[in-house]
Amino acid sequence: MPELPEVETVRRGLTPVLAGARLSRVRINRPDLRFPFPERFVERLEGATVERVDRRAKYLLLPLSTGETWITHLGMTGRFTLDGTQLGEFEEAAPIAGKHEHFSGCAIRDGAATRIGYADARRFGFMGLIPTDQVETHPWFAGLGPEPLGNGFSGAHLVEAFAGKKQNIKVSLLDQRIVAGLGNIYVCEALYRARISPLVAAGSVSKARLETLASVVRDVLNDAIAAGGSTLKDFANAEGGQGYFQHRFDVYGREGEPCRGESAKAGGCTGTVARVVQGGRSTFYCPSCQRK
């Protein structure tokens, strides 16, 4: 599933073409994705101008000139493509299957038209239209915690959120009410960089270590965004290219492999990456340098 860096990469790819563009020739090729498309979806988008392209957690939000905001969640396999437009600097191309394209349209800006496509092979993504002044109170967003790249996220926030919490820190960090948009991959990587065991109770971690963790979370996410996200099975950025952060994983997906020498030099770690299941998700970590 695309996580925050992947969604942010898509947002940055869509912005130069969609922000300020008028939508035209909107089409949907089936009545639903994960949920049915909104009533009169095509009519409500047709002719509207996109004011900007925002992101909240793993959602894309496009406020429109009509007073509504177009919401998209990529689910597990959703992806946008922009034909004829060079976006970002990505390493590989990932062809998109036409039979899975469920939404299309044109973005007209400065006299130029760019075709927009949205494909979702497994159809776990969805689109919605919400009155812009009701977005913050909508059930999709009302319970979300602070953005990990925003000013509201800090070690102090984690200290308060984790106070007395007996649940392990890995699962706690995946709680979208505590921090919005963090997913399994980047929580594993952040805990490794902070040298915190995913097995410890969240409430037992010291303030100093939580300050370090908050800083490391930002670093991991920014590194992933700079690399264009991670390509695991289905993620592709807005032009169909693949992210490359997966080649930098210290622990994720590396069960049985040695703890990376360069990453672990300071602690002299010679451990092996292990995998456990927590909250139904695979957790990868180094038991030697991420001790309880």
Q: Residues of each region from the PLM?
A:
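Phosphate/anion-contacting hairpin/loop surfaces
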Residues: W70-G181, Y186-R193, A201
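A cross-family signal for N-terminal binding/gating loops and helix N-caps
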Residues: M1-G125, V251-P258, R281-K292
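Generic structural motif
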Residues: V53, M127, V273-R275
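Generic detection of long, well-ordered alpha-helical segments
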Residues: M1-L4, P148, G152, S206-A214
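Short, glycine- and charge-enriched coil/turn segments that flank and shape catalytic ligand pockets
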Residues: R40, R44, S65-G67, A113, ...
